[in-house]
Every structure is written in structure tokens, then in C-alpha cells.
Amino acid sequence: MKPVKNPLYVPPGNAKECGDYALDIYAGCPHNCPYCYAPDVLRVSREEFFSHAEPRTGIVEGLEKQLREMREKGASGKTAYLCPVCDPYPQGCDTSVTREVIQCLKRYGWHVRILTKGDGARDADLLDMDDWYGVTLDGNREQWDRETMTYGGLSGEELFESLKLIHKRANTWVSFEPVLDAQMVLRTLRACVQPSPLGERHSRVADKVRIGKLDFQPSDIDWAKFGRAAALVCDSVGLDFYVTDSLRAQMRDCMSRAEFTEFIHAKWNVGDNSTLGPQLLDGAVAYAGGLKPENRLAFFKEMLPSVPEILFESIRY
């Protein structure tokens, strides 16, 4: 395997939402997730990709050289996403290289945004409140039962425990992407915020969650309905959330004006708490239809400040 020269790259697609740059530390991954897109991206067979995980040759040296050159050009304080097409903590492997990579990034004043199904708690001492440590929970019920898990990584319970530990030192997040079991994910969203006598931060397992649909594979989940339900759960427990573009697209233009009016009144009791009864609300929605799309959000935010913004996109005009 040739030494890696410039391991940092600008991430494409949804990955660009996770960092200014991305970095893949390992070649291969033993976790064998059935929905993994990495083999297709890398154009290797699934058998080959899942058969091993080994550090890319010269990854630390290549990273240090690239960071030095970028610093000379004025690039500092950026965030590196670890890792789009591998896991930074592959189970059953020596992950000391991951620690070296984080140490290298920190020496040059960079921050990290980690996403794993493995155990990164051993590197918690390297992280601070400018960093993000995240885990993937796909909602598969098997992920919560170590005895029935059919693919690798920690169980859901073990991943939650790692979040609790690292949350004392850094920001934590959960990626519910792709969602395999909608109801399981909705229950898990509520578990991300737990009552605590020590205050709000101590009550949270995750500071933010990312929610995304299963792409490029069949699913019987009603994505528009699930997206609305997930937004409502996050709003009800005060959980900061982000919906990926592909799921947001499924939610867009999926409700008639009348359905939206009925939905808002059922969920927020708008008529009981304001003068905005059903007819006035329906009229306001009709009025918004005549506004430019970029002005609708500001209009709705002023009219219904308690409603999650993403729900306004669901109206079909």
C-alpha cells in the first residue's frame, strides 16, 4: 500500500455537513453493516472491505506534513471529520493510530468530529468542548441486544455508556442515519435526554442528533410521517436536531393546507392558547403561499414561534 500524501480532503455529499475536512484513517472495516456505502465509494467488494481494518500507510506522517503546509497558508481552527468511509475505532483492532491522528490535529489547533460504532472512550482525555464525539444508532433492534447482533461495533447500550462518559469532556452527538426501525429511533430520541438533579447538561446523553433516511435501498417506512414525528419528539424534549437533506426532501410538500392546519392545532392547541383559530390559521397559510419561499419561514416563525421550523416545509401549496 502506497503512503498517504494528503489524507485531508473536502467531504462530498452529506459528509460535508460534519466537518470542513474529512480524514479516513483505516482501509477496511470489520463491522459489516448491511447498509454501508463505503465499498461502493471505494470500488471494492464487500467481502474485501469487511475482511480487515488496517491503518493506511504513513497516515500520521502524511497528515502532519499536510497540516504544516495548510498552516503556512493560514488554515487553522478547522474541523476534521473522522471518518466518512471507515470507522475510527474498528472493533477488535489496534486503534492507537486514531489517537496519534487526534493528537496531531490538536497540535495544529484543529478540532475533531468523530462518528463511530466502536469504543473511543479511551481517547476522551484528548477532547475538549470544541470537539464532537458521536455514535451511530440505526434503530435496528438487534443493535440493542449483544446476543442477537449480526454485525459489528458496540451494542446500543454500550454506545450510550460511552456517550455518557465522554459528555463530561466534549460535545456529544448521535447519528440516526440510516433509520432502520422508525419506532425504535423515536424511543431512543427520548432517551437522549434524561432527568438529572445536576442540571440540564448532566441530563443529556447527546447535545445534538442527526436524523436521516435509508437511501438507495427499499424501505416500508413512511419517511414524511417519521420525519414529522422525529421533529416533534426532539422539540418536546428540547433536543437540538438536524434532518439530512434527503429526509427533508421527503417531508417537503407532503401536507395540504387543510391537513397542516389540522396537524398544528392537534399538536399545539393553537386555538386554545391564542386568537389564531383554525380559520385564521388556514388563511395565514394561504397568505404564505403568495410569499416568496425565502420569506415564508420568517412569516411562520413570527406567527408560530413554538413550532419546529422544518414542519413549515411540509405544506403543499
Task: Report residues per predicted region.
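N-terminal [4Fe-4S]-dependent radical SAM core
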Residues: 1-76
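Auxiliary Fe-S-binding modules of radical SAM enzymes
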Residues: 1-9, 184-317
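Short aromatic-enriched loop/helix-cap "lid" or pocket-rim segments at secondary-structure transitions
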Residues: 35-37, 126, 253-256
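Generic alpha-helical secondary structure signal
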Residues: 39-41, 93, 137, 291
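Surface-exposed, active-site-proximal loop segments in enzymatic domains
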Residues: 45-46, 148, 255-258
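Conserved AdoMet/S-adenosylmethionine-binding subsite of the radical SAM
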Residues: 60-240, 244, 249
